Amino acid sequence: ERMKVLKFLQKLTNDNLFVNRKTGVVTIGGKRWDNRSKNLKTGTSLLRDVINNKHTTTIYQNTDDERSAIALEKWGRKEFKHPDGSLPGSDVQIDIDLSPTTNTVRNPKTNRSENGYTPAEITLGHELIHSLRYMEGISTSEKEDYKYTDGTYLVTEKKQSVEELQTIGLGRYRNKYKYTENMLRREHNFQQRLSHISDD
């Protein structure tokens, strides 16, 4: 199980990752040779930031289609002040089904939305971005309307999670954060995700 999680973490980064078989702790070694043809700048940096954070993210694998990250303390969200003398942010638990899934993506040729294949490493990257945001205490529970074009149509999705818009890199958050799912998608030549709402 640990090796399977490690395999997908490894696909995101140019660093060589090791897992301690007793504790399950992941550490970074030197450069990885089998990813050398890819420049995985975003993923490499994301994993370094997650691994080097003072808080801990624990990844649990499942097979029941669950894909989520939860903060173990409420001050993983910016709406809650962390107790005096404590670090901002929270430890995190990720529950992830490592089978591929589908998401609403943009077809670059037609500019229309379609249901697109999403491999497990991209989903894992998405949850790791949530996890880093929780560990830094900048996650948010705000909601806002999100608009995008689908071919010639303007689509409005009401009361969307700002946390998801920021994590995926949608709308006005496209270039606002250091890490987004769509940056990871660009790095791996996958279509850009268009919406948090999926058809599955």
Regions found by a protein language model. Give the residues of each.
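N-terminal processing/targeting junctions
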Residues: D15, T102-T104, S131-L132, S141, ...
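Short acidic, glycine/tyrosine-flanked loop/strand segments centered on an H-E-D-like triad
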Residues: D91-P108, I129-R133
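Short pre-active-site segment immediately N-terminal to the catalytic Zn-binding motif
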Residues: P100-T123
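Auxiliary, metal-adjacent structural segments of Zn-dependent hydrolase domains
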Residues: E1-T101
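Structured segments of extracytoplasmic/periplasmic soluble domains
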Residues: F8, L12-D15, S131-M135, L170-R174
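Active-site recognition of the HExxH zinc-binding catalytic motif
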Residues: P119-M135
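Generic marker of residues within folded, mature protein domains
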Residues: D84-S86, E114, E157
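Active-site or metal-binding loop neighborhoods of secreted/extracellular toxin and effector enzymes
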Residues: E1, T118, M135-D200
